[in-house]
């Protein structure tokens, strides 16, 4: 059964028999308060890291599934607001856990990646649509001019008709060439934007995966520290209780403070 802050808070030691040496109650209570505060902080830090790993998993899944979504769907993703760090525990003589790294703004990077992809897609569609509209207009104008010129040429002479048809064919060929060139340029721009957006998306997702790996390693370190901390605390308390029960009544009572300090120093050295 895991040790909880409530267990440390509610622990009670029986007083030694008359004539037996015992620890100072105030010092024992003060030490237990330090243990309770540190254990509470470790549990809260562990829970916070679990929550951040879960949030990174959700952000990674959302970024993968929303890579081709519209800008309206992308704007509905909530921005990540980091939770405040827990209040630091009071100074204590036991081993202190390593400092927690700052929470990365991982959700902002996922939102930016999705928006870049959406913007690239919108720009490509807009360029393609504009180029097609211009090409259709050029073809329509060219056909109208050609028909008018052919009608006028028929009324004048066969020579004028032949010349008009040649000019009409030339205009149609030029319009077709220009429309194909504009479509090709628009497609090249769209492909370049898409490739750049995919590259940025891959870089951002790689950063998110690295941050997730770091947080998972940090979580495992905290788990190991918690297990070692509980084991050392339990061993220390059991050894002190056993030593207290084995000591005889011949030693002076006022030497308890020195033995407390000695045992407490050994416990600190073992943790360090």
Curated annotation (Swiss-Prot):
Low complexity bias (residue ranges): 62-76, 94-105
Effect of loss of the gene: Depletion causes a morphological change in which one end of the cell becomes round rather than rod-shaped. This phenotype is caused by the absence or dispersal of peptidoglycan synthesis.
Keywords: Cell cycle, Cell division, Cell shape, Coiled coil, Cytoplasm, Phosphoprotein, Stress response
Post-translational modification: Phosphorylated by PknA.
InterPro entries assigned to the protein according to its UniProt record, in alphabetical order: DivIVA_domain (IPR019933), DivIVA_fam (IPR007793)
Span of the signal peptide: none
Region (Disordered): 1-22, 62-109, 243-272
CDD domains per the UniProt record, alphabetical: ATP-synt_Fo_b
Induction: Positively regulated by the stringent response.
UniProt-annotated location(s): Cytoplasm
Modified-residue entries (Phosphothreonine), positions: 74
BP GO annotations: cell division; regulation of cell shape
Coiled-coil portions: 30-67, 139-206
A GO term from the CC aspect: cytoplasm
PANTHER family named in the record: CELL DIVISION PROTEIN DIVIVA (PTHR35794:SF2)
Chain's role: Important for maintaining cell shape and cell wall integrity by localizing peptidoglycan synthesis to the cell poles. Protects PbpB (PBP3, FtsI) from oxidative stress-induced cleavage.
Family listed: Belongs to the DivIVA family.
Subunit organization: Forms homooligomers. Interacts with PbpB and CwsA.
Protein known as: Cell wall synthesis protein Wag31
Native organism taxonomy: Bacteria, Bacillati, Actinomycetota, Actinomycetes, Mycobacteriales
This protein's encoding gene: wag31
């Amino acid at each position: 059964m895991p040790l909880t802050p409530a267990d440390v808070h509610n622990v009670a030691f029986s007083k030694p028999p008359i004539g037996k040496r015992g620890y100072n109650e105030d010092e024992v209570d003060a030490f237990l308060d330090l243990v309770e505060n540190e254990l509470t902080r470790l549990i809260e830090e562990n829970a916070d890291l679990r929550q951040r790993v879960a949030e990174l998993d959700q952000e990674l899944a959302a970024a993968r599934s929303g890579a081709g979504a519209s800008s309206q769907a992308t704007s509905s993703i909530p921005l990540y607001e980091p939770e405040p760090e827990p209040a630091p525990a009071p100074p204590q003589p036991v081993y202190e856990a390593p400092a927690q790294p700052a929470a990365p703004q991982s959700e902002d990077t996922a939102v930016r990646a999705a928006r870049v992809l959406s913007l690239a897609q919108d720009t490509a569609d807009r360029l393609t649509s504009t180029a097609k509209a211009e090409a259709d207009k050029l073809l329509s104008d060219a056909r109208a001019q050609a028909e008018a010129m052919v009608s006028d040429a028929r009324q004048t002479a066969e020579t004028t008709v032949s010349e008009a048809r040649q000019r009409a064919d030339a205009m149609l060929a030029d319009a077709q060439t220009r429309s194909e060139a504009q479509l090709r340029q628009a497609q090249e721009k769209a492909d370049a934007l898409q490739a750049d957006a995919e590259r940025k998306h891959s870089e951002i997702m790689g950063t998110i995966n690295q941050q997730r790996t770091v947080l998972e390693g940090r979580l495992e370190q905290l788990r190991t520290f918690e297990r070692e901390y509980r084991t050392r605390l339990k061993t220390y308390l059991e050894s002190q209780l056993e030593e207290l029960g084995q000591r005889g009544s011949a030693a002076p009572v006022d030497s308890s403070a020195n033995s407390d300090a000695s045992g407490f120093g050994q416990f600190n050295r073992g943790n360090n």
